[in-house]
């Protein structure tokens, strides 16, 4: 990684390394707690009728797509992680602070789910907002989605001036 990110100073990247680790720890710890305390399919109401913790073993990708295709999903995930890391390192000095945060979140979420695929052969999902959403997901998914939204916001609202010039 040091050769690939050789143009990035360690001091410049410490905030992103710290954010990456904090997000990864939150994701992995929440999965560990759910995996060790709940049975598959078990639901614990947190906010009645709105938010539950429900233990699901997802053997596909987001929204339950590609169930049982763990090999293909894992290969695609490794490629995506590599591309994200390459882009982040190559463009670190060119992209904005908001984009750096966004890519760090996406990278952390992708690594969090990849850890599950490698060590469990499934991804632990538990965040269940039945009142408004039919899918059950995890914190890694949250980080990825927030990161994508931040990139979209950056490009729509903050890069307009660059495009107009």
Curated annotation (Swiss-Prot):
Keyword Transferase: no
NCBIfam families tied to this protein: lspA
Location (main, coarse): membrane
Transmembrane portions of the chain: 6-26, 68-88, 95-115, 132-152
Lineage: Bacteria, Fusobacteriati, Fusobacteriota, Fusobacteriia, Fusobacteriales
Catalytic residue list: 125, 141
EC number in record: 3.4.23.36
Gene behind the chain: lspA
Subcellular location: Cell inner membrane
Native species: Fusobacterium nucleatum subsp. nucleatum (strain ATCC 25586 / DSM 15643 / BCRC 10681 / CIP 101130 / JCM 8532 / KCTC 2640 / LMG 13131 / VPI 4355)
Pathways involved: Protein modification; lipoprotein biosynthesis (signal peptide cleavage)
GO cellular component, one term: plasma membrane
Top class in the EC scheme: hydrolase
The protein, known as: Lipoprotein signal peptidase
Alphabetic keyword roster: Aspartyl protease, Cell inner membrane, Cell membrane, Hydrolase, Membrane, Protease, Transmembrane, Transmembrane helix
Catalytic activity: Release of signal peptides from bacterial membrane prolipoproteins. Hydrolyzes -Xaa-Yaa-Zaa-|-(S,diacylglyceryl)Cys-, in which Xaa is hydrophobic (preferably Leu), and Yaa (Ala or Ser) and Zaa (Gly or Ala) have small, neutral side chains
């Amino acid at each position: 990684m040091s050769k690939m990110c050789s143009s990035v100073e360690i001091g410049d990247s410490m905030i992103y390394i710290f954010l990456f680790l904090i997000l990864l720890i939150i994701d992995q710890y929440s999965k560990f707690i759910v995996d060790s305390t709940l049975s598959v399919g078990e639901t614990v109401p947190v906010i009645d009728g709105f938010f539950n913790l429900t233990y699901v073993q997802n053997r596909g990708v987001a929204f339950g797509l590609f169930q049982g295709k763990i090999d293909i999903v894992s290969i695609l995930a490794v490629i995506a992680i590599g591309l994200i890391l390459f882009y982040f390192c190559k463009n670190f000095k060119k992209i904005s602070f908001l984009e750096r945060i966004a890519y760090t979140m996406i990278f952390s979420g992708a690594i969090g789910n990849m850890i599950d695929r490698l060590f469990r052969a499934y991804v632990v999902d538990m965040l269940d907002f039945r009142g408004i959403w039919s899918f059950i997901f995890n914190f890694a998914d949250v980080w990825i989605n927030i990161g994508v939204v931040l990139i979209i916001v950056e490009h729509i609202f903050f890069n307009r001036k660059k495009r107009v010039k």
